Regions:
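Amphipathic alpha-helical protein-protein interaction surfaces
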Residues: 24-27, 100, 125, 129, ...
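Short, well-structured hydrophobic secondary-structure segments
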Residues: 49-51
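Hydrophobic-ligand binding "helix-grip"
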Residues: 29-33, 37-44, 54-103, 109-111, ...
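Residue-level detector of alpha-helix boundaries and kinks
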Residues: 3, 13, 80, 118-125
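Short amphipathic alpha-helical segments
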Residues: 14-20, 128-132, 136
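Hydrophobic ligand-binding cavity/cleft-lining segments
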Residues: 1-46, 154-155
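A short acidic/glycine-rich loop-to-helix N-cap element
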Residues: 109-132
Length: 155
């Protein structure tokens, strides 16, 4: 399985606020063009939810349904695909305090389920996933930059 980690720092937003925005899946389509649709079912007895996603992916759309498990005290969300276009898609979001705001870490493991083309397709899918996560975070949180790097100065 291909592993992807994206760490971005959101400027001027505290971790609790960032976590609440990232947890509010229903708002994604109105805040970023990358996510075309999200349907969230009512919470299950254990607090997890099932959500159905339609996301722009290169020149097409990827669709999947996932189980999302929220950990507000840790400001983290774990997800696992239940069905959809990936063979496997699972990972997490985490929000941590940073002197200038919040560092958001997105981790995912995925398998497109086409072993004979994995060497060609996986790097493209990884790049697209990284770009999509950055666009999603910009839409949700505003100014973001790769963790550890300062945003570009304009003047």
């Amino acid at each position: 399985m291909r592993q992807v980690t994206v760490r971005m720092t959101a400027q001027g937003i505290d971790p609790e606020h960032a976590y609440r925005r990232i947890s509010d899946f229903r708002r994604y389509p109105e805040l970023t063009t990358t996510v075309r649709a999200v349907e969230v079912q009512p919470p299950r007895p254990d607090g997890s939810v099932v959500s159905a996603w339609t996301v722009a992916f290169r020149n097409g759309l990827m669709r999947w349904t996932e189980r999302d498990t929220f950990s507000p005290a840790a400001r983290s969300i774990a997800f696992e695909q239940l069905s959809g276009d990936f063979e496997t898609f699972e990972g997490s979001w985490a929000c941590e305090a940073h002197p200038e705001g919040t560092t958001v870490t997105f981790r995912a493991a995925f398998d497109l389920g086409i072993p004979t083309l994995a060497e060609i397709l996986d790097p493209v899918a990884e790049s697209t996933l990284r770009t999509n996560i950055e666009k999603i975070l910009q839409g949700l949180l505003g100014t973001v930059s790769p963790a550890g790097l300062a945003p570009a100065a304009h003047g």
